[in-house]
Amino acid sequence: MKRSISRWSALFALTLAAGTVSAVMAVPAEAATPLQVCRTVKGTATFTPGLTNTPRDNVVKAKGNMTNCTGKPGGPKTGGSGVLSATIKVVKGSCVKLAAGNQTIKGTAKTVWKNTKTSTYALTLKTGTGSAGTTATITGKVTAGLFKGHSVTGQVKFTVSGTPNCTTKPVKAATFKNTKSFIIH
């Protein structure tokens, strides 16, 4: 049970992180030359009020750094890195529900690039199942700012912070790191 709770917690955190990361995935076939690729995305996420075995609404806030970013020659410039933040609203989230995986969660995120330009995203995070339960695949669209109208993809893996047990000690925090590059198509 402890492993299931940890997996769920990690999955939830990943989902949140994924929102923060904004788009960390593989490049679709139709996007031969991405507009921006960030090879490293990592950070932290907090859950309020925290995940337990009892379903309840949670707000996940994630913050992180995107580095090793390169753009398409002649395309918009970012300065090579950015700071991202995300807000994910989880309706009736619980350790049990997330441990099962195969969850679809929506959220918003924003990147402030090194050159001070910004990109705002609408995201959908889809969690895996089984051994991929702590991995979230991200898809979405840039809704404002630099790269507006373009799609984003990504993938992140998260790890629960501390020693939550989902009964007396809720999942309140996690770290995340991309497993595939953050890409704006």
Give residue ranges: language-model regions:
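Glycine-centered structural positions embedded in regular secondary structure
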Residues: V41-G43, G107, G154
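Classical cleavable N-terminal Sec signal peptides
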Residues: S4-F12, K106, T116-S119, L123, ...
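Solvent-exposed, flexible loop/coil residues
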Residues: I5, L51, P55, S151
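Secretory targeting and sorting signals
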Residues: M1-A31
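N-terminal segment immediately downstream of the Sec signal-peptide cleavage site
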Residues: E30-K92, T163-H185
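A charged, solvent-exposed segment within the mature domains of Sec-exported extracytoplasmic proteins
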Residues: G128-H185
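Predominantly extracellular/secreted and cell-surface proteins with exposed
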Residues: N53-T143
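Small disulfide-bonded, cysteine-rich extracellular recognition modules and tandem repeats
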Residues: S4, T20-V21, V41, K72, ...
